[in-house]
Every structure is written in structure tokens, then in C-alpha cells.
């Protein structure tokens, strides 16, 4: 099985932030996790700091982990499931942007040759 990620940028409709968070946490994450091969869901919010730039159309990011031997079939299943997923008014529809990712490599500080050994 190969691991993939679906990144979804969104933002709440102004003035409906509480409703947006409730919908996402109490309903939508579980709705997406019902799609075959989707195994984890994690939400993030943009950290506002000096010089921070918005890299996507939304201030919020959901990252879904997928494990699949056939990502094309998984993507098709997701698109089919999307047709019945709720799009509540608390979600700014213009902010929704999806992108699919496949890891190219990974490293931890403990395995990096540039990080000094603490021993």
C-alpha cells in the first residue's frame, strides 16, 4: 500500500466561524473518513505571524491520509462521495481547493547527517 495525502484548503463564511468549526469537527471529518482508503484526518489553521503569506485560498487546511494500491480508484471513489457531501452555508465555497500528494521521501532529525549527535 502506498501512502498519499489529500490537502483541502477552506475558510469559514465571515461571521459563521463557530458553525463552520462545529460542522467540520462533528460531521465532515467523519464523512470523508467513510471513503474507502481514507485513514486519518487532521485540521490546521494558518498561524498569523509577521510576513505570513496565505499559500492557498483558505485560512484552514484539512489533511487526510490515504493508503491505497490504486490511487486513481480512490480518487474516483472520493469524487463520487463528494456528490452527496454537505456544503453548508458556513463554508465559503470559493475557498475550497483540493490537491493530492504522494511523499517523495522523509527524514527525521535523528537520521539527518547534518544534525550533530547529542551523545
What do these predicted ranges mean?
Residues 1-119:
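Macromolecular interaction modules
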